[in-house]
């Protein structure tokens, strides 16, 4: 089974994806880790690399191509990135969307990255706006369109174990025999 975990920065994607992969004994691949490594290799912060990606679309396209290739080639995998559900498309068996209010996400990022809350909030908002515009420009994706996801979870409502419990129940309850049709991922320009 290929499970995708998507959502905005600070929504808990990495926390859930790692826990879910461990619970299911699946492999875990993180687009965020790949992106942060790219930023570090270039001597940039993720926000700076996001800004550079506004001018150089190949940065996003290389990452997204890699995610789509991984989705096409692997099974028993939790694939995590902002666009994992979109990039995995028809290859995904279950697409999860995580979210939380901006202040909650900014607080998580401030704690994780040891920076002031207001700075984290501003950067998180700017990063989200930058990414949403690029996703629209490159692939005609509306990042706010959640219709492709099988389950959406507000991670501010539960602690990480609770989020895992909710999503693990959904995954373990899934049966291809009872599946009347997953939400299609249509009209995406997979032009890498």
UniProtKB/Swiss-Prot annotation:
Name of the gene this protein is made from: cmk
Gene3D superfamilies, per database record: P-loop containing nucleotide triphosphate hydrolases
SUPFAM superfamilies: P-loop containing nucleoside triphosphate hydrolases (SSF52540)
Assigned GO CC terms: cytoplasm
GO MF term list: ATP binding; CMP kinase activity; dCMP kinase activity
Annotated GO biological process: pyrimidine nucleotide metabolic process
Catalysis: reaction(s): CMP + ATP = CDP + ADP; dCMP + ATP = dCDP + ADP
Domain of life according to the entry: Archaea
Name under which the protein is recorded: Cytidylate kinase
Enzyme class of the recorded protein, top EC level: transferase
Location of the protein in the cell: Cytoplasm
Keyword terms of this UniProt record: ATP-binding, Cytoplasm, Kinase, Nucleotide-binding, Transferase
Residues where ATP binds: 7-15
Coiled-coil ranges per UniProt: none
């Amino acid at each position: 089974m290929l499970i995708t975990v998507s959502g905005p920065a600070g929504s808990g994607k990495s926390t859930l994806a790692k826990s879910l992969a461990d619970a299911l004994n699946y492999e875990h691949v993180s687009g965020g880790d790949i992106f942060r490594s790219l930023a570090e290799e270039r001597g940039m912060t993720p926000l700076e690399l996001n800004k550079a990606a506004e001018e150089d679309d190949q940065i996003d396209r290389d990452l997204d191509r890699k995610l789509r290739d991984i989705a096409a080639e692997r099974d028993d995998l939790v694939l995590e990135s902002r666009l994992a559900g979109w990039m995995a498309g028809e290859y995904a068996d279950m697409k999860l969307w995580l979210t939380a209010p901006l202040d909650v996400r900014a607080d998580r990022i401030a704690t994780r990255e040891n920076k002031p809350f207001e700075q984290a909030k501003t950067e998180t908002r700017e990063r989200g706006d930058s990414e949403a515009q690029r996703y629209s420009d490159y692939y005609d994706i509306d990042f706010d369109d959640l219709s492709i996801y099988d389950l959406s979870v507000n991670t501010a409502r539960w602690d990480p174990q609770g989020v895992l419990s909710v999503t693990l129940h959904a995954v373990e309850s899934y049966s291809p025999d009872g599946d009347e049709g997953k939400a299609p991922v249509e009209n995406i320009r997979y032009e890498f």
